[in-house]
Amino acid sequence: MKPLVCSFIVILLILLPTTISHDYSDALTKSILFFEGQRSGYLPREQRMTWRHNSALNDGKNLNVDLVGGYYDAGDNIKFHFPMAFTTTMLAWSAIDFGSYMSPADLRDNLVALRWGSNYLLKTVSQLPNRIFVQVGEPTPDHQCWERPEDMDTPRTAYALEAPKPASDLAGEIAAALAAASIAFKRFDPRYSKLLLDNALRTFEYADSHRGSYTNNPETKLAVCPFYCSVNGYEDELLWGAAWLRRATGKDSYIKYLVENRQSFGSDSNYFEFGWDNKVGGVNVLVAKEVFEKNVAAIAPYKDTAEKLMCSFFLETPGAHMSYSPGGLLYKPGSSQLQNTVALSFLLLTYANYLSKSSQQPLQILSTTPLWYLTQRIANIVGFEKVDYILGDNPMKMSYMIGYGNRYPRQIHHRGASSPSITTHPTPVKCSEGWNSFSSPNPDPNVLVGAVIGGPNIDDKFVGGRTNASETEPTTYINAPFVGLLAYFKANPV
């Protein structure tokens, strides 16, 4: 097959920008620590973010089920299971492919963060094949209040779907998360790994048997939308779940599934997207690993589409490609910009890592003389620029990781960080009272160390402030892939 050629502006790739030196080890440790600030439920004695305390201890009570635990997705107090599952998948992928670059302490903490998510996801599928749990908390009342998690008195309604109502996207992502986590824990805790895999298998069976989107069900749509509607459909999560189960089990039946459903499920559509809603980019990169390692010809089209994604990082390529801000930030429209930057950069580095370890010909990315190819170093340079932009090498000279460096936003859109801790202010802060903290001109009393926030706009401008949620709200699904990127650059600085 003739190699796919992607032309681009060479100077962007072969000349490194003048940057300050960053402490990737410190950033990595902090990016994992962030997850302790998002914990829900009973907090352990070894909790390092001591301004956080137990919260939401009756979750699931309205359905007579234990749904205590898990993560709050962002700056509010809702547990949305769809993005939580994606977060868990990416924490697992970071551990699987980049755990060898982490220190023993960082790898341990990453696995602790992963287990916190996977333990909770096991609860969400504990009643399959009859019922799957979708979410805990009512967004409208929650968003009408500004309450720290420890005090919240808004309804903690748990939502569930009964079979045969469809939930392919939610169940497919949970299956992917549990399968990926089973791989991450296989060496450290084989019994737990098997438990995760067994549940991944039956969750995927539910996803495939009851096809359709979980947000198409009236009883959950009003609770989930517009926050985490499955806009991209459910088919990508079925491919995503199958790809992770193939990697976890090695079974050829998942190869067959991927081959039979590739076109009808849209693996070559919107291939330059990756995040909590759209898994197409991730599917193609993950399946490409099979082609590199085992030369499975039947799934080679996934690798071909992954190549198109890689080419889209370079501006003068034919067809769709990424957009960049004047300061070099990979930019896609959305409510939280850096989630796109981090997730897509993760795929670039991961694909190049797979390619560099294979015997296959590198991807040709320039057709002039001399020829240039997508090598590990080229990917490193591109990924390095995006990581360093987040850490402070940007026109604002601002670190978008809270607690990293000397200049980072002191006010973020986060209830727990902006409210006084119950350690210093044990009196409950009620719904309307909390808005005093929201509108305070003072810095947040609690530093949510390691949180990567939404970030700047397409012109590299950053206004900040608690009212500007798109710029200052952190999310778990930004940090999860960032863990892998930081681990790699800690061991392989450009």
From Swiss-Prot:
Key word Secreted present: yes
Subcellular location: Secreted
Annotated SUPFAM superfamilies: Six-hairpin glycosidases
Glycosylation site positions: 468
GO MF, one annotated term: cellulase activity
UniProt KW keywords: Carbohydrate metabolism, Cell wall biogenesis/degradation, Cellulose degradation, Glycoprotein, Glycosidase, Hydrolase, Polysaccharide degradation, Secreted, Signal
EC number, as in UniProt: 3.2.1.4
Active site (UniProt): 76 (nucleophile), 413, 473
GO biological process: cell wall organization; cellulose catabolic process
Coiled-coil features, chain-numbered ranges: none
Gene Ontology CC: extracellular region
Annotated signal sequence range: 1-21
Catalytic activity line of the entry: Endohydrolysis of (1->4)-beta-D-glucosidic linkages in cellulose, lichenin and cereal beta-D-glucans
Family classification: Belongs to the glycosyl hydrolase 9 (cellulase E) family.
Protein's name according to its UniProt entry: Endoglucanase 22
Native organism: Arabidopsis thaliana
Taxonomic path: Eukaryota, Viridiplantae, Streptophyta, Embryophyta, Tracheophyta
Gene: GH9B16
